[in-house]
Amino acid sequence: TDIIIMREGLSLVRDELVRVLDALAGFSDKYKALPTLGFTHFQAAQLVTVGKRATLWMNELLLDLEEVEHRIAALKLLGCKGTTGTQASFLELFEGDHEKCKELDRRIAREMGFKGTVPVSGQTYSRKVDAAVLSTLSGIAQSACKFATDVRLLCHLTEVEEPFETKQ
């Protein structure tokens, strides 16, 4: 079930990334001609547009989206490997027929919406899968941190300002 939960979670993350990218695309298009000062290592450089700046954030998130989609596609179900990964109980049920065990794995994977199962395992899937998913999520966090830091620095320079309401 962990792999199924990971796939569902990554799918939710993917959908949110698409929504953020869509919002940034609208923002970028709206401000594509609005000039602003560009920076290199937070030192004034040359004019860019606000829209161009937003496309830099979008590019990072697009790379993250590609990684999330790759990670979802690469997930493989554990299948029916048994308590030690040998499929011993299934081999007994299928009277030693390894092909029937493989077919059972294929059917389970297909039924659960996966392209395949891991070829070899112990009782559980490899924790390398957890590390790969964590790395993917870390990449999104890095992009969000860059985006947020840029906005914060631009607020300091009053390039970007928070709106204030009359009753605030």
Name the predicted role of every residue range.
Residues 15, 46-168:
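Internal glycine-rich alpha/beta core junctions
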